[in-house]
């Protein structure tokens, strides 16, 4: 079992989606985690609602700082940054990490601020989910 950490700034949307996809669809090979460099302290309510409607279990999922993963209690095999801010920030040296991969994924939370339309909110969530899911699928195909 390999541990995968997804990092973004707020740990409220993109990294939460990625963690959820890993733990839902690839739980036989991977354990997903997420964290933020400046966590918001909560999962974005639109993303939370979207994932729950898709049947994802978010009981153990919460917004947290990446410092929680620097204590070596959990060996992280792969680290992904899923936003430019997290990629460009001074990130810690990850103990025992195998690789760091950067995916520049557009922030759905910024788009949510421009609408109150439930259909648009769902479309934004779905596009973000599909983007992340596709990247994870491609990465797993090449993961040895």
At which residue positions do the language-model features occur?
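Conserved active-site segments centered on acidic
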Residues: 1-70
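Short glycine-rich anion-binding loops that position phosphate/pyrophosphate groups of nucleotides
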Residues: 10-12, 84-87
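Residues at the C-termini of beta-strands that transition into short coil/loop
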Residues: 36, 83, 104-106
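Phosphate-binding/catalytic loops
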Residues: 88-144
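Alpha-helix C-terminal capping/helix-to-coil transition sites in glycosyltransferase folds
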Residues: 74-75
């Amino acid at each position: 079992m390999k541990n995968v950490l997804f990092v973004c700034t707020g740990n409220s949307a993109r990294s939460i989606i990625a963690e959820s996809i890993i733990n839902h669809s690839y739980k036989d090979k991977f354990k997903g985690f997420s964290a933020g460099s400046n966590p918001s302290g909560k999962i974005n309510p639109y993303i939370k609602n979207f994932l729950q409607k898709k049947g994802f279990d978010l009981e153990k999922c919460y917004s947290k700082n990446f410092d929680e993963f620097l204590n070596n209690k959990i060996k992280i095999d792969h680290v992904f940054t899923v936003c430019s801010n997290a990629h460009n920030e001074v990130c810690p040296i990850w103990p025992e990490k195998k690789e760091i991969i950067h995916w520049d994924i557009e922030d759905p939370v910024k788009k949510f601020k421009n609408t109150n339309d439930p259909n648009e909110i769902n479309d934004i969530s779905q596009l973000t989910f599909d983007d992340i899911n596709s990247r994870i699928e491609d990465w797993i195909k090449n993961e040895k």
